[in-house]
């Protein structure tokens, strides 16, 4: 049926252009219709994206599928080129799945400037889907930067008391990293033109450029810093707690579920295949594993002393992303697949936790853990949803959190057992900071009169949480369909890392001579 509709030829364009059309539709409509229009547009995008699960065929190998390319800026060799592999497939699905749930979760929260807010949410979806589906480096950078604008305004306008500070900090951190990446992109483009006579930003063309080990190391640093800030990993994480605490609930959901994944996706998409000699250099591997482990342990201990439930969950993101980083730089199939599964599980579970904390805030107008107690007695379904999601975040067997962390640790233990032992302690620390919060909020004595008035989940809230909880359990029980789709692409990335050899001086000289001869013939 999908082939009869020529689904592969237009779907990725639709997933980008439909929310963009929705953005203008929301701005044009009446204020009281904005949230419903945004929800409808995002649901249409999600329903269309579901077909990607069947359209992508892992039997065809780990390369890009559903590709399409349109000329954009021909003089620079820039194309509007889109495609998916077994890595980006899940990031696109996570983005389209999370956006309508975040929008639906905002209905009781966003009261002012609704048209602007929901237009920005749809524009944010345009950016994140574009980041994960672009196969042209210039186009990737455009979408990467585009996501910065709507999130800045979402935090700065609809956030908490310190929203302006948090928004500016978020903007400056990520913009600085992006500028370094831009320098790296321009350098790669210039080297491709000088060495191969290629004027193209297409991934497949740029991968052919014979960069020296020194060039790869410097470019790795430029790209790695940009993505490390976006993840964020220790010590570039300080913008994240402020952004999460001050952002409105739907902003926190999208930030945790999707935007942070842009950084770790960048690690896999660019650092490993584009700069393989740097990526597998022992000093680089040691540095990245060390930063990942420090992030896991440090974030766990800081989370354990947080009085604010939302800030506690914000620090869990730093810990989970630490697991992703060590999985990626284990440089083996188990570690890389585990890191990708942690990305997916974290996106769903942490997004759900922020929604649940937002629901508690709507009822009690506080996020301080000490102000709660005994909520499970008056709101049993709310308590049940929170407990399940917290257990997923900890990594309980039978949930998506366990599968990802298990594979990650398995991959790390293969090559770096010392790092694996330290990282395993992070699983224990996760229980140390998460379970006391659950105990304090839901199962301590029901003493405060305000807590007796807390209502249970509404139908709208059940509709939001049910698919998230179901997906976390389904992935935990039966992860094979996900692993089968991502494994060929993971294998292809790792083959590129280990097959790469430093280009000899003779090779570079011969390439340059051929380029000069070609230019002379043309003249």
Regions found by a protein language model. Give the residues of each.
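Transmembrane helix-loop-helix hairpins at membrane boundaries of multipass inner-membrane proteins
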Residues: 1-11, 25-119, 199-208, 492
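Helix-coil boundary and interhelical linker segments in multi-pass alpha-helical membrane proteins
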Residues: 2-6, 129-137, 268-284, 324-341, ...
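Central hydrophobic cores of alpha-helical transmembrane segments in multi-pass inner-membrane proteins
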Residues: 13-28, 40-54, 92-106, 124-125, ...
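Membrane-interfacial loop-to-helix junctions in multi-pass inner-membrane proteins
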Residues: 31-45, 109-123, 135-141, 159-180, ...
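Juxtamembrane/interfacial segments at transmembrane-helix boundaries in multi-pass membrane proteins
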Residues: 57-79, 179-237, 242, 267-287, ...
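Alpha-helical multi-pass transmembrane bundles of energy-transducing inner-membrane proteins
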Residues: 116-123, 127-215, 229, 302-315, ...
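Predominantly late transmembrane helices and immediately cytosolic-facing juxtamembrane segments
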Residues: 234, 350-353, 421-453
